[in-house]
């Protein structure tokens, strides 16, 4: 092989290797910043079509309804823990260390974004509450499908009295 061909071959191999390295780093960065949406049932039982469950340490978004009576606040800090459930019976505990949105209430729909812990709790970095009684985030509405039922607070209050 003459020196000119050898130089071209070395340059081509280096160029292909560089492009492959850049592509793999780009895919790794995109994958680590990807936030997948799950319902509480999908976290507990896995996705319905694939059976895939999120791994501990994975960054995810969870949408569902805040379970009535599940909210526990720490009186000395902003730490709050509550459960989120869906119509299929799945439930996950969420911890949050910041101010909750003004519209956050038990029995309301929310979307929480954070990291799934080894213990199955979601350490939320962001909690979004729905706007009014008719609004539901698109991901939550799609995931809950036709099984979502609006809570009737008047019946709950009369039963409690």
UniProtKB/Swiss-Prot annotation:
Matches recorded under SUPFAM superfamilies: Heme chaperone CcmE
GO cellular component: plasma membrane
Compartments, as annotated in UniProt: Cell inner membrane
GO molecular function, one term: heme binding
Topological domain ranges for the Cytoplasmic compartment: 1-8
UniProt protein name: Cytochrome c-type biogenesis protein CcmE
Periplasmic side: 30-161
Higher taxonomy: Bacteria, Pseudomonadati, Pseudomonadota, Gammaproteobacteria, Alteromonadales
Homology family: Belongs to the CcmE/CycJ family.
Keyword Metal-binding tagged: yes
Amino acids binding heme: 131, 135
Pfam families: CcmE (PF03100)
Keywords: Cell inner membrane, Cell membrane, Cytochrome c-type biogenesis, Heme, Iron, Membrane, Metal-binding, Signal-anchor, Transmembrane, Transmembrane helix
Record function comment: Heme chaperone required for the biogenesis of c-type cytochromes. Transiently binds heme delivered by CcmC and transfers the heme to apo-cytochromes in a process facilitated by CcmF and CcmH.
Stretch forming the signal peptide: none
Annotated HAMAP family: CcmE
Region (Disordered): 138-161
């Amino acid at each position: 092989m003459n020196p000119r061909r050898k130089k071209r071959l070395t340059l081509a191999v280096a160029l292909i290797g560089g492009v492959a390295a850049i592509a793999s780093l780009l895919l790794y960065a995109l994958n680590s910043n990807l936030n997948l949406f799950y319902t509480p049932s999908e976290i507990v039982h896995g996705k319905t079509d694939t059976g895939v469950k999120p791994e501990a340490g994975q960054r995810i978004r969870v949408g569902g309804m805040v379970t009535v009576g599940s909210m526990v606040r720490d009186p000395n800090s902003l730490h709050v823990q509550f459960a989120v459930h869906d119509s299929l019976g799945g439930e996950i505990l969420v911890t949050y260390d910041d101010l909750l949105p003004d519209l956050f209430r038990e029995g309301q729909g929310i979307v929480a974004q954070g990291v799934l812990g080894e213990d199955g709790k979601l350490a939320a970095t962001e909690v979004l509450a729905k706007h009014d009684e008719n609004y539901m985030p698109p991901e939550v509405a799609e995931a809950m499908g036709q099984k979502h039922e609006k809570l009737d607070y008047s019946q709950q209050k009369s039963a409690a009295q």
